[in-house]
UniProtKB/Swiss-Prot annotation:
Pathway involvement of the protein, from the record: Cofactor biosynthesis; (R)-pantothenate biosynthesis; (R)-pantoate from 3-methyl-2-oxobutanoate: step 1/2
Name of the protein: 3-methyl-2-oxobutanoate hydroxymethyltransferase
Keywords: Cytoplasm, Magnesium, Metal-binding, Pantothenate biosynthesis, Transferase
NCBIfam families: panB, PRK00311.1
Reported function: Catalyzes the reversible reaction in which hydroxymethyl group from 5,10-methylenetetrahydrofolate is transferred onto alpha-ketoisovalerate to form ketopantoate.
Reaction equations catalysed: 3-methyl-2-oxobutanoate + (6R)-5,10-methylene-5,6,7,8-tetrahydrofolate + H2O = 2-dehydropantoate + (6S)-5,6,7,8-tetrahydrofolate
List of residues binding Mg(2+): 67, 106, 138
EC number: 2.1.2.11
GO-annotated biological processes: pantothenate biosynthetic process
Active site: 204
Organism: Mycobacterium leprae (strain TN)
Entry keyword Acetylation: no
Length: 286
C-alpha cells in the first residue's frame, strides 16, 4: 500500500464506515507532516487490548499507555507508585490491539531520573519487552540529556512539560504551570526537549497564550492537555473522556459519554435476569 495515498489523520467524515478507509501504520513522520499541513489530531490513553482495538478502529492515530494507569487501573492516588513491571503487560496488550496507531509508553517515576544510562535501560525494556513504538518521559531541561541519549539509540521520545504529574509532590499539588515569571522557564523547557531530539511534546496545564507561543516556536508537534485550542494535538485519559472516572474530573476534561452509567445499568440488568431465571434464555443454550 502506498503511503502517499493513505489517510493518516483519523476517520474520514465522507464515509460512515471506518473499515473502508485506507490506512497505514502511523509513524512519527506522519505527526510531523500533520503539523506542517495544519492538521490537528487526537491522542488517547489505552491500557488493554480491547480498548486499544476500539480506539484504533475509530482512527485515533496515537495511543498512550500512560502512567495514569496508576490511577485508573491500579487505584493509586498518584502516578508516583506505579512501576515498569506493572506497566509493561499493559503495553503488550495495547500494541496487540493497535493495528495502525503509534503506541507510546510512559516511563514511570524513578526509572529515568538517575541519568541517561538508567533511561536507556528502562526505555529499551519498553521497546523490546513491551513492543512500544516510542516512550514518553516528564521534564524539560533537566531530562534533555536522557532524551538525547534515547534518540541517539534510535528510540523515539515524546516529552512532557508544564504540569508533570510525577512531580506532584514537589510542585505543591495540581497547579497550572508557566504563569507570570515561570513562563520563561516553560519556554526554555520546550526548546530544550525539542533540541534534544523529542519528536513531540505534551504541554499540561499551561496557559493558552503561552502554549500558543510555544506551538508557533517549535517545529515538533505540541500536544495539549489543559493547554488551550491552539496546540497541534490534544490528549485525554480515556476514562475521563468517556465518563468512566470516579469523582470530580479536571476542568480541561470534556466527557463524551457516560460509560460508567451504561456499565452499571448493564450489570444490574444482568444480575436481575439471572436472579429471576430470565437469563440464559433458550437462544443462549445448546
Amino acid at each position: 500500500m502506498s503511503e502517499q495515498n493513505v489517510n493518516v489523520y483519523g476517520a474520514d467524515p465522507s464515509t460512515s464506515s471506518i473499515q473502508s478507509i485506507q490506512r497505514t501504520k502511523i509513524r512519527t513522520k506522519h505527526l510531523q507532516k500533520m503539523k506542517a499541513e495544519g492538521h490537528k489530531w487526537a491522542m488517547l490513553t489505552a491500557y488493554d487490548y480491547s480498548t486499544a482495538r476500539v480506539f484504533d478502529e475509530a482512527g485515533i492515530p496515537v495511543l498512550l499507555v500512560g502512567d495514569s494507569a496508576a490511577n485508573v487501573v491500579y487505584g493509586y492516588d498518584t502516578t508516583v507508585p506505579v512501576s515498569a513491571d506493572e506497566l509493561l503487560p499493559l503495553v503488550r496488550g495495547v500494541v496487540r490491539g493497535a493495528g495502525h496507531a503509534l503506541v507510546v509508553a510512559d516511563l514511570p517515576f524513578g526509572s529515568y531520573e538517575p541519568g541517561p544510562t538508567a533511561a536507556l535501560a528502562v526505555a529499551t525494556r519498553f521497546m523490546k519487552e513491551g513492543g512500544a513504538h516510542a516512550v514518553k518521559l516528564e521534564g524539560g531541561q533537566r531530562v534533555a540529556e536522557q532524551i538525547a541519549c534515547l534518540t541517539a539509540a534510535g528510540i523515539p521520545v515524546m516529552a512532557h512539560i508544564g504540569f508533570t504529574p510525577q512531580s506532584v509532590n514537589s510542585l505543591g499539588g495540581f497547579r497550572v504551570q508557566g504563569r507570570g515569571g515561570d513562563a520563561e522557564q516553560t519556554v526554555a523547557d520546550a526548546v530544550a526537549v525539542a533540541e534534544a531530539g523529542a519528536f513531540s511534546v505534551v504541554m499540561e496545564m499551561v496557559p493558552t497564550e503561552l502554549a500558543t507561543q510555544i506551538t508557533g516556536k517549535l517545529t515538533i508537534p505540541t500536544i495539549g492537555i489543559g493547554a488551550g485550542l491552539n496546540c497541534d494535538a490534544q490528549v485525554l485519559v480515556w476514562q475521563d473522556m468517556a465518563g468512566l472516572s470516579s469523582g470530580k474530573v479536571a476542568r480541561f476534561v470534556k466527557q463524551y459519554a457516560d460509560i460508567a452509567g451504561e456499565l452499571r445499568r448493564a450489570a444490574m440488568q444482568y444480575a436481575e435476569e439471572v436472579a429471576s431465571a430470565v437469563f440464559p434464555a433458550e437462544e443462549h443454550c445448546f
